[in-house]
Amino acid sequence: MPAIFRSVNTDLSKVDRLLYLVNSTYFFGIGKNTIWDTSWGDEVTEENPPMTESSVVSLPDIKLYKSPIYQTLAVESQCGTVDFDSCGNSEGSKKLTLINLETTSRETLNIISPSYLYFKIEIESGDLTFANIENFRVAGLYKDTTFNNPGQIRYLPTSVVNQGTLYWASYFTPIQKNNIITTTYVQEIIIKA
């Protein structure tokens, strides 16, 4: 699951860039409710979805956009509060501590020098009902997506004014609605900045 990190103004300090990014508006897009087939590659099947390329700029057939329930900065630590086996970066397993931005001073941020953006998204069966789909096979994190009626937590693609910039993308085997009726599909995304 590659992170697709787009450029940000480099005249800003590292902490300023991270604060700009974490305070931006993000939406998690899900879609592709049709099967994976060989039109995506000779070896592609439902059980063997295509690899996500870092050059991808948009996702196919988005059916729903939903805002993250939590987004913050994170820093590597030996006593991390969150352990990610697969963070979507090439550095492998990391222990990270999530930073409470409401209680952490700017001076402390400069000292601890966070290097990660953290997002948590939850997709429930009601979200799939809202989007009128039974499953999905792609997901992506978009920055600065704009909609006709701002202020909602989820949108259909017909409400999109500007899709924004794709920062993270993943293709996978189908997530079925009947599998998330009693549980919630949770996606945690770490992007090294």
Predicted regions located by residue number:
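Small cysteine-rich, disulfide-bonded extracellular modules of the LU/uPAR three-finger superfamily
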Residues: 1-136, 144-193
